[in-house]
C-alpha cells in the first residue's frame, strides 16, 4: 500500500497539472528511515525493501526537499502515530522543514499535517475534505 503515497510524493513535483495532493503513511525523515536502524520504526537496513530504495535519496535529498518542489500547491500529509513505518516525532521534524518553503512564499495554509493516533492507514474523510477544499473552487 505504501507505493501509492510514494508515487504521490514523487509525481507531484514533476506534474504541474496535479493541483493538490495527499500523502498518506509515507512522508518520513527519509535519511533515518533508510540508514538508522531503530526499534521505534522499520529501517531499510533491516528489512527486505530494496524496491523502495532510490539512488541519491540518502545523500542528495529528503522528503521535505520533495515538498519544496510541490510548493505552493496544497499538500496534506497524513500519518498515524502507531505506524511502525516511522517514528512520529521525526515526521514532525521533517514536516517543519517542509513548512519552511510554504512559509517563505506566504502560503502556509496550503500545507497541513494530520498526525492521528492510528496506524498505517488512510483517513478517507480527512483526505477528501482537504481535496474538496482546494479543488472545488
Range-by-range predicted roles:
Residues 1-2:
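Conserved alpha/beta-hydrolase "nucleophile elbow" surrounding the catalytic nucleophile
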Residues 80-82, 116:
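Short strand-loop junctions, especially beta-strand C-caps/beta-turns
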Residues 18-66, 72, 84-95, 104-107:
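Mobile cap/lid helix-loop segments that gate and shape the active-site cleft of serine hydrolases
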Residues 9-10, 64, 96, 129:
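Active-site phosphate/pyrophosphate- and oxyanion-stabilizing loops and adjacent acidic/basic residues
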Residues 5-16, 131:
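Short glycine-enriched nucleophile-adjacent loop
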Residues 96-137:
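C-terminal catalytic histidine-bearing segment of alpha/beta-hydrolase fold enzymes
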Residues 70, 77-79:
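Short beta-strand/loop motif that positions the catalytic acidic residue
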Residues 20-21, 77, 110-111:
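Acidic/polar loop patches that form or flank catalytic/metal-binding clefts of enzymes
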Amino acid at each position: 500500500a505504501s507505493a501509492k503515497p510514494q508515487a504521490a510524493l514523487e509525481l507531484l513535483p514533476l506534474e504541474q497539472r496535479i493541483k493538490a495532493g495527499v500523502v498518506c503513511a509515507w512522508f518520513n525523515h527519509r535519511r533515518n528511515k533508510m540508514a538508522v536502524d531503530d526499534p521505534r520504526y522499520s529501517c531499510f537496513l533491516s528489512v527486505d525493501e530494496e524496491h523502495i530504495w532510490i539512488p541519491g535519496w540518502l545523500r542528495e535529498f529528503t522528503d521535505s526537499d520533495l515538498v519544496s518542489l510541490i510548493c505552493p500547491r496544497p499538500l496534506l500529509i497524513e500519518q498515524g502515530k502507531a505506524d511502525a513505518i516511522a517514528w512520529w516525532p521525526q515526521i514532525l521534524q521533517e514536516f517543519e522543514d517542509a513548512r519552511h518553503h510554504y512559509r517563505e512564499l506566504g502560503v502556509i495554509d496550503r500545507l497541513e499535517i494530520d498526525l492521528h493516533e492510528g496506524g498505517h492507514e488512510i483517513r478517507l474523510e480527512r483526505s477528501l475534505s482537504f481535496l474538496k477544499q482546494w479543488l472545488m473552487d
